[in-house]
């Protein structure tokens, strides 16, 4: 029995595994006060970058795919929404391919 138990690999249960990683402070790509040249109106003003702390916290995690999947797993409606979006994208691609094929005839 002792020989049998030595063949198994022990699983580490250290506290490091249970601790969630701390949120890293994200630094924006441009300093505060920089003109972003996003104006689309003739008489409008250019948008100006703000301090990083003035933006909402969720903004820094929008592009993280892990973050989207994590929240979708928590929310069953969100998971259904992701599945619906995927199906809509697939249908749109198919429609575009069909239209391109028909335009070549």
UniProtKB/Swiss-Prot annotation:
Q: Does the keyword Amino-acid biosynthesis apply?
A: no
- Gene Ontology terms describing biological process: mitochondrial translation; sporulation resulting in formation of a cellular spore
Q: Which InterPro entries match?
A: Ribosomal_mL54
Cellular component aspect of the GO annotation: mitochondrial inner membrane; mitochondrial large ribosomal subunit; mitochondrion
Its keywords, alphabetically, are:
Mitochondrion, Ribonucleoprotein, Ribosomal protein, Sporulation, Transit peptide
Q: Which Pfam families match?
A: Ribosomal_L37
Presequence range in chain numbering: 1-24
Q: Does the keyword DNA damage apply?
A: no
Domain of life according to the entry: Eukaryota
Task: Please state where this protein is localized.
Answer: Mitochondrion
| Major location (coarse) | mitochondrion
For molecular function, the Gene Ontology terms on record are: structural constituent of ribosome
Q: How does it assemble?
A: Component of the mitochondrial large ribosomal subunit (mt-LSU). Mature yeast 74S mitochondrial ribosomes consist of a small (37S) and a large (54S) subunit. The 37S small subunit contains a 15S ribosomal RNA (15S mt-rRNA) and 34 different proteins. The 54S large subunit contains a 21S rRNA (21S mt-rRNA) and 46 different proteins.
Q: What does this protein do?
A: Component of the mitochondrial ribosome (mitoribosome), a dedicated translation machinery responsible for the synthesis of mitochondrial genome-encoded proteins, including at least some of the essential transmembrane subunits of the mitochondrial respiratory chain. The mitoribosomes are attached to the mitochondrial inner membrane and translation products are cotranslationally integrated into the membrane. mL54 may have a meiosis-specific role as it accumulates during the middle stage of sporulation.
Q: What else is known?
A: Present with 1100 molecules/cell in log phase SD medium.
Q: Which family does it belong to?
A: Belongs to the mitochondrion-specific ribosomal protein mL54 family.
Name of the protein in its database record: Large ribosomal subunit protein mL54
């Amino acid at each position: 029995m002792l020989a049998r138990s030595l063949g198994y690999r022990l699983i580490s249960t250290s506290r490091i595994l249970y601790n969630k990683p701390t949120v890293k402070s994200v630094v924006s790509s441009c300093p505060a006060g920089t003109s972003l040249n996003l104006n689309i109106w003739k008489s409008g003003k250019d948008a100006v970058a703000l301090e990083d702390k003035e933006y909402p916290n969720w903004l820094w995690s929008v592009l993280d795919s892990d973050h989207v999947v994590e929240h979708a797993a928590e929310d069953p409606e969100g998971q259904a929404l992701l599945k619906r979006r995927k199906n809509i994208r697939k249908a749109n691609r198919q429609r575009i391919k069909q239209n391109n094929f028909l335009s070549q005839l």
